[in-house]
Amino acid sequence: CISTQVGCPVGCVFCASGVGGLQRQLSAGQIVEQAMRVRELCTDGFRLSNIVFMGLGEPLANYAATVQAIRTMNAEWGMGIGARKITVSTVGLPTQMRRLADEKMQVTLALSLHAPTDELRRELIPWAERVSIDSLIEAGKYYFEVTGREVTLEYILLGGVNDSIEHAEALAGIAK
């Protein structure tokens, strides 16, 4: 998992990354350096083959540095990691999701949904008050239409909070 920020502005109630809030953005070089350090640590025939932007921070809230880092990691002169082996995980910024689609880089987009309703999602992800699940799904459809890459849904099960049969059925409806 690669971080794009020091701290996180999102404040998900189940995640420690946002406890101190956002401290600062990382540069593209600092983002790439994390992957390079991991690659240096690889031994015994193990090689770094996949990158997930899911460490500290919201990757699409540091859009320019994230995209520049992806291009560097993907480039033959950089790390030579295939775009389809790079995943960007986001809580969902629809405008940035569409921008990423328009970059046509073929990276995998993963949407951290964590709730099947806007009301519950706002409780779990305070930042979610800015955007509806419907707008995220529309941005995800756009991403698929432009890139041909399916969007992955991420969902943390929290006992007694978002794990009922009704939640599962609603989530299945969203995933269709």
Where are these regions (language model features)?
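Short acidic/polar capping segments at secondary-structure boundaries
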Residues: 5-9, 18-22, 36-38, 54-59, ...
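Cys/His-clustered metal-coordination modules, chiefly Zn-binding fingers
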Residues: 33
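Conserved AdoMet/S-adenosylmethionine-binding subsite of the radical SAM
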Residues: 39-50, 55-176
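Canonical Radical SAM [4Fe-4S] cluster-binding loop centered on the CxxxCxxC motif
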Residues: 1-30, 44
